[in-house]
Each structure stands twice: as structure tokens, then as C-alpha cells.
Amino acid sequence: MKLTCVLVVLLLFLPYGDLITNNYIGGAARKVTPWRRNLKTRDVCDSLVGGNCIHNGCWCDQEAPHGNCCDTDGCTAAWWCPGTKWD
């Protein structure tokens, strides 16, 4: 029973690990986790490349909770950079 509870808790928190470990401290973001770094290959706005989205050059909004593009006209609901999802 205890093992089942531990597994359930882990499964609940693993998808949110980046939100927990990538907190903003004193206005500066911590280094990104490997999970976040892995998103580069999917064209998500990434702070590792100077705050730019991969391919289209849109700027990251560091205040945004999910690191979405700050160009709100082009930012999708899923925080993909516009026009790059299938590049």
C-alpha cells in the first residue's frame, strides 16, 4: 500500500518537476533542468539561446510561468513558437 501511494505521488509530480525546480529566485531564473533543455528540439521558447525561440527568433517572456513567447499575437495556447511546430 505504501509503495502504491509513493508511486502515485511520483506520477503526479513528475510532469511538474520543471515548475518546481525552475523557480525564479530574486528575479533570476535558475539553470534549466534537462527536461526543459530537451524542449529545444520541439521549438519551444528557450532561455538557453539568449531568450529566443528556436528558428523564428521570437523573444521569451521571463515573467511568463511557462516561458511562452512574449509576442502574444503569435503565441499559441500551448506555448509553441508560431510556425515552427513541424519544422
From Swiss-Prot:
Q: Which family does the similarity line name?
A: Belongs to the conotoxin O1 superfamily.
- According to UniProt, the name of this protein is Conotoxin Cl12.3
**Record propeptide residues:** 20-42
Q: Which organism is it from?
A: Californiconus californicus (California cone)
What the entry lists under InterPro entries is as follows:
Conotoxin
Q: Please describe the organ and tissue distribution of this protein's expression.
A: Expressed by the venom duct.
Single GO MF descriptor: ion channel inhibitor activity
* Compartments in which it is found: Secreted
Domain annotation text?
The cysteine framework is XII (C-C-C-C-CC-C-C).
* Post-translational modification comment from the UniProt entry: Contains 4 disulfide bonds.
The residues forming the signal peptide are: 1-19
Q: Work out whether the entry's keyword set contains Secreted.
A: yes
